[in-house]
Swiss-Prot record:
Keyword Aminoacyl-tRNA synthetase: no
Name assigned to this protein: Small ribosomal subunit protein uS19c
UniProt feature coiled coil, ranges: none
PANTHER family: RIBOSOMAL PROTEIN S19P FAMILY MEMBER, SMALL RIBOSOMAL SUBUNIT PROTEIN US19M
Species of origin: Marchantia polymorpha
Keyword Chloroplast carried by entry: yes
Length: 92
């Protein structure tokens, strides 16, 4: 079930304040955040946000096509190492 429209998108307060301050100063700095659940809103376009993936912060440049998605969608938490090349036991 999707979020109710009357509630509006969730954006962490500290993240929104940082972005609004940078917009007023017209600065472009990397913003570090752990808030993967925050929704990308139009005021974030053009900023670089470093999202935590469990080990490190991955810098993500926000574009207009990302609006409405969550920050966590662009910072994968698991690394896929690939399938085993010569595993003959599993073929039986």
């Amino acid at each position: 079930m999707t979020r109710s429209i009357k509630k509006g998108p969730f954006v962490a307060d500290h993240l929104l304040k940082k972005i609004e301050n940078l917009n007023l100063k017209k600065e472009k700095k990397i913003i570090i955040t752990w808030s993967r659940a925050s929704t990308i809103v139009p005021t974030m376009i053009g900023h670089t946000i470093a999202v935590h993936n469990g080990q490190e912060h991955l810098p993500i440049y926000i574009t207009d096509r990302m609006v409405g998605h969550k920050l966590g969608e662009f910072a994968p938490t698991r690394t896929f190492r690939g399938h085993a090349k010569n595993d003959k036991k599993s073929r039986r």
